C-alpha cells in the first residue's frame, strides 16, 4: 500500500505543476524552469559570450547547462558536476559525484585543466529538512565551496552566479563576494518562486 503524501508535499506538487515556468519548460522540452532564471540573469547582466569556458555546479537536471550552451556556442566549453545523474547535453562534460568529496573536486579540477574558467555558476542546494536552523547552514556550506572553486579556477575579470538562501550567514557571504569582485548584484528572477528564500548573487569582474 502506498504511503500518503503529507499536506506540505501535496501542496508543493500542486504548486509545482501549476507553475507557468514549469509548464513553459515542459512545452519547450527544456530540462527545468531554472533555464528561465539564467536567461533573465543573462538579459540583465550579460555573463556569457561565445567561446567561454563555464563550470556548472549542481547541474542536474541540466537547465543551466542547456541554457549556457546556447550562449557560448560550439567553441565554448562547459564542465558540469552533480551528485545526481544527468542526461547528456552536447557540449557539456558531465561529472557525477558529490562536490563536497575531495576526490570529486580533484576530478573536476582535472577536467578544467590548465585553462582558466570565465564563469562559475552554482545552483547547488542541500536536501531540505524543513528546519531553517539545519537547512541554512547546509546551504551556506555549499555556496562557500562554490566560492572556493572560483578562487581556484576563475580568470581575472571572470564572473560568478550562485543561488543563495537568505538567512544566517548571508550578509557575511555577500560581503566576502563584494571583496573579490568589482560588481555584485542580488537578483530574484521572475521564475524564482516568490515565497522561496532563494536569491541569486551575480558577481562580475573577479579581481585576482
From Swiss-Prot:
Positions annotated as active site in the UniProt record: 163 (proton acceptor)
EC number in record: 2.1.1.166
Coiled-coil zones: none
Keyword vocabulary terms for this entry: Cytoplasm, Methyltransferase, rRNA processing, S-adenosyl-L-methionine, Transferase
An annotated GO cellular component: cytoplasm
Cell compartment(s), UniProt: Cytoplasm
UniProt keyword rRNA processing present: yes
Catalytic activity field: uridine(2552) in 23S rRNA + S-adenosyl-L-methionine = 2'-O-methyluridine(2552) in 23S rRNA + S-adenosyl-L-homocysteine + H(+)
Domain of life: Bacteria
InterPro entries given in the database record: RNA_methyltr_RlmE, RNA_MeTrfase_FtsJ_dom, rRNA-MeTfrase_E, rRNA_MeTrfase_gammaproteobac, SAM-dependent_MTases_sf
Entry keyword Cell inner membrane: no
Chain's role: Specifically methylates the uridine in position 2552 of 23S rRNA at the 2'-O position of the ribose in the fully assembled 50S ribosomal subunit.
This protein's name: Ribosomal RNA large subunit methyltransferase E
Native organism: Actinobacillus succinogenes (strain ATCC 55618 / DSM 22257 / CCUG 43843 / 130Z)
Organism classification: Bacteria, Pseudomonadati, Pseudomonadota, Gammaproteobacteria, Pasteurellales
